[in-house]
From Swiss-Prot:
The modification N6-acetyllysine is found at K40. It is found in: Cytoplasm, Cytoskeleton. The record marks Y451 as: Involved in polymerization. Its cofactor is Mg(2+). Tubulin is the major constituent of microtubules, a cylinder consisting of laterally associated linear protofilaments composed of alpha- and beta-tubulin heterodimers. Microtubules grow by the addition of GTP-tubulin dimers to the microtubule end, where a stabilizing cap forms. Below the cap, tubulin dimers are in GDP-bound state, owing to GTPase activity of alpha-tubulin. It is an enzyme of class 3 (hydrolase). Gene3D superfamilies: Helix hairpin bin, Tubulin/FtsZ, C-terminal domain, Tubulin/FtsZ, GTPase domain. Keywords: Acetylation, Cytoplasm, Cytoskeleton, GTP-binding, Hydrolase, Magnesium, Metal-binding, Microtubule, Nucleotide-binding. Signal peptide: none annotated. This is Tubulin alpha-3 chain. It comes from Hordeum vulgare (Barley). GO terms for biological process: microtubule-based process. Belongs to the tubulin family.
Amino acid sequence: MRECISIHIGQAGIQVGNACWELYCLEHGIQPDGQMPGDKTVGGGDDAFNTFFSETGAGKHVPRAVFVDLEPTVIDEVRTGTYRQLFHPEQLISGKEDAANNFARGHYTIGKEIVDLCLDRIRKLADNCTGLQGFLVFNAVGGGTGSGLGSLLLERLSVDYGKKSKLGFTVYPSPQVSTSVVEPYNSVLSTHSLLEHTDVAVLLDNEAIYDICRRSLDIERPTYTNLNRLVSQVISSLTASLRFDGALNVDVNEFQTNLVPYPRIHFMLSSYAPVISAEKAYHEQLSVAEITNSAFEPSSMMAKCDPRHGKYMACCLMYRGDVVPKDVNAAVATIKTKRTIQFVDWCPTGFKCGINYQPPSVVPGGDLAKVQRAVCMISNSTSVVEVFSRIDHKFDLMYAKRAFVHWYVGEGMEEGEFSEAREDLAALEKDYEEVGAEFDEGEDGDEGDEY
């Protein structure tokens, strides 16, 4: 088996996690108490969904997941919610004291006390796997727990499970909508370790997803639940090929191989189509060509950056539902002829496609319409650098005056860590610039010394 362990850290990670597991359960017909009436092989078996669920002898399906937070309120909602019987109580780890939006508290003082417990639980899950493929890590880098404890866990996972791939789904601060003043600090410090310790990171951004909900689903005032359900569709599409059998299956390591041209250039944009409300879906013909086009629309991107300002290096299209390879090839050919979608000149093919025959499921009473086919795109575009340059700019404004820095130093950090992380991000911005530049100086000009 190719099992994946999901790790949900901090409030954002946990709430996205709730939406994802709710959707997985729907897709596989698993009830909130973990029973699965349709499962013929009770107590194990080699079903494809066993990559995400482990089965007990009593026929109960338990998610291979860990939820961690430094304060109890969010995890208590899981403990008392609809899916309280789905999770093993040991999988829900909560501390007593908040990270208070402070990276240093999440990484050094408070996170340090809880991290061994987390690794212990992860070790138990890993021992329960026959062929662990990797980790999916969900967190946000604006807060204290997601950024601090998230980085700490990633660093420790690299030590304990060196070769296993780590995919991050990371919520980055939005340009306009901010939830805390020190977001830029936390994000820069946290990205510093995301660079080292994740193999692929998919960037999400609340503002971009708000706009998609507002525009495509006509929700006037989207809530986090609306956002998370949209994000969970993306994550479900990515992992569908691990959980179902399909025509062109893509596993986690394939993403890495096809999307990451250089180790540091691994921050991805994602988009999903069709995002459409039930009223509209009834009147529209959502062909493969149409949904492929709308996945490339700048307004469909789930992070606030405009792919027209950069070039694509590679992209991965995951179709699900009633889709045949012939349609996909035609749709991709059309995309390639478009002038607005530019690829770097050193990556001529640039497309990786996967097809899964399981049609997309939707949460009953949710916002999305039930459709016959859908596509999720993960793309590596140089325009992602906009996300970083925005955060870096805000970081510089604050750090020039050393505003709020004493809170971090008081928790045992050194100022040197700030400048080190900031320099690392400056180097990242430069890397993206070089990758997007046309090659004039032969194959490999000044990139030889980088790696």
